[in-house]
Amino acid sequence: MKHSSYFVLTAVCASVAFMASAAAIADMENPAVVANTTGVEVSGSCTMVDFETPEDKKSYSAMPFRRPKMRISDKFASSGRHSLEVSWDRAHRMGFTIRIPETDFSVYDRLAVDVVNAGENADQLTLHIAAKGDKLDDSVYSANGKRSTHYAPIGKSTWLVELERWPKKAEKSRSKVSELRFYALHPYGTTMYLDNIRLLRKGETFVAGRYSPEDEARISAMVKSEEDRDAATRAESKAALAKSMASVGMKSDAMLVGAATAMEHVLPKAPDALSKVKAVRGLKVRLARGEYESVQIVVAPTKDALKRVSVKCVEDLSGQGGMPFAASNIACVVMGYTRTQYQAPYAVGRTLYTNSADRAGYWRRGYFPRPGWYPDVILDHVRETDVAEDVAQSFWVRVACPRGQEAGVYRGELSVSAEGVASLRIPFEVRVNGFEVPKLSTLPVAMNFNPKGGLGWLPTNAEYAERMAAKKDPSAPPNIWKKRHMQWVDFLADYLITYDSLYRLSRSELDPEPNWEALMHLNKQGRLGPFNLAYWGTRKPGEKSMKQWREKTVPYYRKIYDKAKSLGILDKAFFYGNDELNPKDFPNIRRSADLIHKEFPGVPLFTTARDVDFGVGTNSLENVDIFCPLTGRYNYERAEKARAAGRKIWWYVCDGPTWNCANLHIENKPIDARSMVGAQSVFFKADGFLYWQLSKWLSPRTIGSSPFTDWVAASCFGFNGEGCMTGVGPDGIPLPTVRLENFRDGLEDYSYVKILKDKIAAHGKEDDWSRRARRLVAIPPSLVKALDCFNDDPSELYSWRNEMADMIESAIR
């Protein structure tokens, strides 16, 4: 039921509508006189706003954002005859507020908004439900009020805002809501129609918005237009790949097959996915002994869906004189995909060439990635899968070269098959270099592996319930992995990472002491890298603090220190702590450092505290040994000055940096990870790399056999993949991500540089060979020019890497 007069909403109201006269809409144009409502039956105990009453223009915004164009429209009304039309452009932060009479939301459990996106782009809005005077904090790190984010594809949708759980700081606002604040931080630009903003009581049946036959026809036409565009793009991409396949002598009436490097994303459901894929006469992989290197084979149906698709190396590869390269060293497994639900709160970068003839003529530009299905967890336990007609399915082909393998070229075939379809054979060549990479990363790494679940950023009620239950569920990822504890230790070492906890405290649930069994296991294998004894914090002045130091901290540290010393691994140890603290904390950090150095000599102190001078400036932490700035804050000149004074300067990433710098988010190109710990770490002389978490697992279930997983992408504050570089398969088996694979590849690239530097030193003379070698280890500008200007073209990285391999092999001969 609707009313044209103004009512004050109370907890006992039912079916009361607040019209535009009760809603001050920011920058709304004066609407023409409108007719009475059409009598459509709507869902909701209270319809608050349905835009049916004319109102003078009022300007109001609680946010420092650009205001969109707004007006009352006679299109896409789901209640009555009118809706609110809102239009905004690309990239500019925008926001608008709808005022309502002060309302008690505590008796309702949902708010619904009918939405039609009639623009050219899918887009999203965040809604902040607020009392008058509430401050809007649009940070992704905190929620000072009731907030939710909603994505609108082209066409119609209804946004449901769950009202049951409110942040504690916003509880007082819950009973006196007066403003609905909509905003977009990084919009794509579109036109949306909002209508029938209503409240629903607990248990009340939700009914989606209904539109007139004319509007339904418009909506259907919009959706079909988008579907037709996508279908045309997909058909064009398929036709181009089919033509390319024919040109290399590969033909199939049912199956399209191409290749991509391991450093690229092939988005499985993107209409243009196959445009990223190349038909090949054959595939080649080059690697050193002890190294891993991968490539992707992408399969798509020509028309109808394919069943039981697989890629296999069916026979050993053959080298000179019949020397075999075992097929068991070549894993061909299904790529898994993770769905990002919303537009990320950050931009990622891509390389644009300014001159195609000059490979050093490039720059970087940031863009905000679309939500959707991204390659992420590699399903090492899955060898075959079905492929739907609109999917481009990647298979990860990982080559592991045994350390005893003879150098040379090995040739064989990969077979691509599907049920009822003739197999396609791809010539496959593996070239083994005449040298070996170390078992340990040449670039020291410190990475936290401390599996945890969590509730995530603004979870829905269902997500909240599942994640709470997962805490006590023995089959949930944060628990079941423990069944395979030592398998995880070896798995991480295979990726050149030492099993460790950076945030170890005496009260830690997992590993309050270093896991001595794991560390000695790795030490015996020659794969033990740097590890953390315990977390060190600040120390305040005064007897109370010193008493705690003597009675609690020293005994805890002493036990761990003495154990590491007795096992003969103290030389690998450090104390990590004072994570990202600011200069105001420096006096207490210095006090703590003095105490630790005196009591536990020989163990370096490691911190990400924000000392921009790295221990050699005014108000610096002169008694700290290892500094670790964020890559985006790394200052080369200051780092070199600190190194000259005996400090080590590592670097790290977390949620930042974003835009044009490399990072480890799901949407970042995989090559970002490889470049960051490989070429970039060489170029900027980083002494090591730190990462705060490998195992932030919010998913309540392990990963199954479907490529389209329900593994949670937004692992930390809406940052996709942040702190989550691994996945958990059936029964707790470890699974890598594409990012982790590229991370290892980058560390192996770094090893190539170290090996070549050693060859330069041994060469001992100035000639064409040494000049060419020094150019390679200095990192050519075709790869890296600045932190925010590096090349993401895989061919450039391969060219550099292969040239280094040639130089190393020529030095050996």
Residue ranges with predicted function:
Residues A23-R66, F206-A217:
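Extracellular carbohydrate-recognition regions
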Residues M222, R229, H521, W536-G542, ...:
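Catalytic domains of carbohydrate-active enzymes that cleave complex glycans
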Residues A300, V314-L317, T338-Y342, A347-R403, ...:
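Aromatic-lined carbohydrate-binding surfaces of glycoside hydrolases
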